[in-house]
């Protein structure tokens, strides 16, 4: 296996063992730089990420890598700045990603390059860390060419392509929303990569809302707020991921409001992603909500069967692994939640087959994914837990779902609860009616059918149901 395959398989294994926050903030932006003589060198972009990996995830990371490669592995975590320090005295050219600027408290010795080898005489491969850590800003693998287009994401793909070809023009801001692992981050990176391919002098910055918040906190602590503002307000294209996490953070929202205004008034392009539409982000300031709605809002839906099949075939080709059509079909039918889990399942199957020297068959896939498929069969969640999740999502009390209140702000959440109870539990219509204040089973049937019909035409409602379902999956530990 090459480094990319090893790292993807490791991430797939760790995704189910770590919190979403740790996975997104610490693991996904990291990169396996080399694996030589039993030492895996992991590259990260900041001291915060390094500290988080070493303090919270070092043991799980070491164990996962050991399982993937089949022999004991030690882990070293290295910061991109270590390799960049010899060059940082030169002024960066336009288009250079400012996230790689050196931190004053990084004290590790500089490491100009790394080698990777399999310990069996394979030629060492030189890796330029600055290029490798571009994945912390723009991942060169995430392009429009590598994005599989289907009915679930065609509009989002077209809008992103239009922005990349004409930044600062139409669809500003562009707001993408949808569930976890559906390709929003891929599209953000694809925009940035295409913009820079067409004009390397354009300043592009990809950043998560969490990093924006952390940078602001650090700037305030170090009394460097002006430097922070210069960094974020002197760019041509801002790509900001998971904006929902700034909700409820007053200082972050205030700073982002002014950043947005500065960039937008200068005809700089802003592309934002979220797991829900602006109207559904509770505690988001109204002035930000209205600005997010100035441009185009597009939802990214879960892939249909044809798209899942195409994604798996493209992934197998990228991995240079032959996967029989019947196995592709098996995975496409079994893994329906999101693209990340779909690709992760193929990584696991390929790694399992290689490590056990087995052909890739449906039996091999079933064995490799036994825990995942077993969870799908055994998964249970209480009806009360679903009611709690629904009520928290809509900002109401569970008792309001049970009451006779017929105002729309309660009726819709109640019908969503009926629908999800029917879909996610084995409760009968009568059981659901009793749970919701003794309602007749025909009322429950009407509510379920109404939501089932409207999610096909109402993108806002569909995103609401998707977001709630994701919380249900997280509670199940899937």
Swiss-Prot record:
Binding residues for ATP: 181, 183-185
Keyword terms: ATP-binding, Cytoplasm, DNA replication, DNA-binding, Lipid-binding, Nucleotide-binding
Q: Which GO terms describe its biological process?
A: DNA replication initiation; regulation of DNA replication
What InterPro entries does its record include? AAA+_ATPase (IPR003593), Chromosome_initiator_DnaA (IPR001957), Chromosome_initiator_DnaA-like (IPR020591), Chromosome_initiator_DnaA_CS (IPR018312), DnaA_C (IPR013159), DnaA_dom (IPR013317), DnaA_N_sf (IPR038454), P-loop_NTPase (IPR027417)
Which cell locations does it reside in? Cytoplasm
Is-annotated flag, keyword Iron? no
Q: Which SUPFAM superfamilies match?
A: P-loop containing nucleoside triphosphate hydrolases, TrpR-like
Major subcellular site: cytoplasm
- Top-rank taxon of the source lineage equals Bacteria
Return the annotated region ranges for Domain IV, binds dsDNA. Answer: 354-478
Q: Which GO terms describe its cellular component?
A: cytoplasm; plasma membrane
| UniProt xrefs under Pfam families | Bac_DnaA (PF00308), Bac_DnaA_C (PF08299)
Entry function:
Plays an essential role in the initiation and regulation of chromosomal replication. ATP-DnaA binds to the origin of replication (oriC) to initiate formation of the DNA replication initiation complex once per cell cycle. Binds the DnaA box (a 9 base pair repeat at the origin) and separates the double-stranded (ds)DNA. Forms a right-handed helical filament on oriC DNA; dsDNA binds to the exterior of the filament while single-stranded (ss)DNA is stabiized in the filament's interior.
Quaternary state and interactors: Oligomerizes as a right-handed, spiral filament on DNA at oriC.
Task: Reproduce the free-text note on domains from the UniProt record.
Answer: Domain I is involved in oligomerization and binding regulators, domain II is flexibile and of varying length in different bacteria, domain III forms the AAA+ region, while domain IV binds dsDNA.
The record's annotation in NCBIfam families points to:
DnaA (TIGR00362)
The family annotation for this protein states: Belongs to the DnaA family.
Q: What is this protein called?
A: Chromosomal replication initiator protein DnaA
Record lineage: Bacteria, Bacillati, Chloroflexota, Chloroflexia, Chloroflexales
